[in-house]
């Protein structure tokens, strides 16, 4: 027979474990080097992931990484079933209606274009407006993805010839290489990381800089409404402001 005192202790331990689990902040990420990726040591590393890891440690906020596609991250954060944050999101007015945002964790480099090395239409430093106006070019975009306020506005207003795809960027760059589409737009640090991979070594793709390129966007933690303001404040104090 379990003695009453021992049974009570077991209950308290169980309740403590549940409380600890509930107090652990879930931080969602998806495989997107150089921003975030699961490493061989089991941890999550990258430009934005490392900033958050350091901030959580300094702030003393218990957390755990959980891999989830970006579209699912937004759904879960909207539902607000538990305290959770998504890594590296752009801040948008429509997102602020259902989420809280940390201070900025990273500032992207200016936008560039990735296209085939032998495509003369990208020679020199074309403007993004000229590329969008050229109906012989097909832009490849990621389904449900924001390219920043300026580019989102230009895409909506100028309606360039475009095709959307939900694949990861490495697969999408393969589509550019095979001439199924003509170009993608992305931050320069991401493009450099992708083009350095062995899988794209023979892709014959190049980075093209733009005349008057859109400034790089700031990235944030996008959190569900149930994340306490006090927790976000602690995280904010521990984040080193990006340049």
Where are these regions (language model features)?
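Acidic, polar ligand-binding/catalytic clefts
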Residues: 66-133, 209-214
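Ligand-binding cleft/hinge of the Venus flytrap
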Residues: 52-61, 132-136, 141-166, 195-202
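Extracytoplasmic small-molecule ligand-binding "clamshell" domains
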Residues: 22-98, 165
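Short coil/turn segments
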Residues: 31-33, 40-45, 116-121, 136-147, ...
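Periplasmic-binding protein-like
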Residues: 29-33, 108-110, 200-236
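Short helices/loops that flank or line small-molecule/ion binding pockets
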Residues: 71-84, 100, 169-192, 197-198
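Extended ligand-binding regions for polar small-molecule ligands
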Residues: 46-59, 117-125, 129, 217-243
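N-terminal signal peptide c-region/cleavage motif recognized by signal peptidases
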Residues: 14-18
């Amino acid at each position: 027979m379990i003695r009453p005192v021992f049974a009570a202790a077991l209950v308290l331990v169980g309740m403590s474990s549940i409380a600890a689990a509930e107090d652990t902040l879930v931080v969602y990420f998806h495989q997107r080097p150089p921003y975030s990726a699961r490493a061989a040591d089991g941890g999550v590393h990258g430009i934005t992931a490392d900033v958050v890891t350091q901030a959580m440690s300094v702030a003393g906020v218990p957390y755990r990484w959980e891999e989830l596609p970006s579209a699912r991250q937004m759904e879960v954060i909207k539902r607000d079933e538990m305290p959770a944050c998504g890594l590296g999101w752009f801040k948008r007015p429509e997102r602020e209606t259902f989420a809280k945002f940390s201070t900025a964790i990273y500032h992207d480099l200016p936008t560039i274009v990735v296209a085939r090395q032998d495509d003369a239409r990208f020679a020199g430093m074309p403007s993004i407006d000229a590329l969008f106006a050229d109906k012989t070019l097909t832009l490849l975009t990621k389904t449900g993805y924001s390219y920043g306020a300026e580019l989102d506005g230009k895409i909506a207003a100028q309606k360039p010839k475009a095709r959307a795809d939900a694949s990861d960027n490495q697969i999408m760059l393969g589509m550019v290489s095979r001439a199924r589409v003509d170009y993608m737009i992305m931050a320069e640090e991401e493009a450099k990381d992708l083009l350095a991979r062995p899988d794209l070594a023979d892709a014959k793709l190049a980075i093209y800089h733009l005349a008057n390129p859109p400034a790089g966007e700031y990235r944030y933690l996008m959190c569900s409404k149930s994340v306490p303001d006090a927790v976000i404040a602690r995280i904010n104090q521990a984040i080193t402001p990006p340049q």
